[in-house]
Amino acid sequence: MQSIGIKGIGYYAPENVFTNFDFEKIIDTSDEWIRTRTGITERRFATKEQATSDLACEASLKAIESAKIKKEDIDLIILATVTPDYLAQGAACIVQHKLGLSNIPCFDLNA
């Protein structure tokens, strides 16, 4: 019987930072008000040129490095997002293509 598992994890946070102090400049709020109610101090935003699949590819490459494997060792891609690149097409197949892994299954998990 073949086993299944997660060998590595990775993440990618875009470089564009928007802090609570930035919010203070555009709406009637404060860093303290936001932080005490949400715990959030900053948010990260992708550029207009970056899609969800681009962010997922960056995270995937970090996961591959973390697992100390080659990308060809991957047997399945599962992408979980509420913000796919397109409404009618999943982003997992785009990540699959960008990673050059067309011979394995992939699917999106959306909530």
What are these model-derived regions, one by one?
Residues 93, 100-110:
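A glycine-rich phosphate/pyrophosphate-binding beta-strand-loop-alpha-helix module
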Residues 47, 81-82:
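N-terminal transmembrane alpha-helices
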Residues 48-52, 106-111:
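Active-site nucleophile and cofactor-binding loops and adjacent substrate-binding regions
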Residues 72, 86-89, 103-106:
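Short, flexible active-site-proximal loops enriched in glycine and acidic residues
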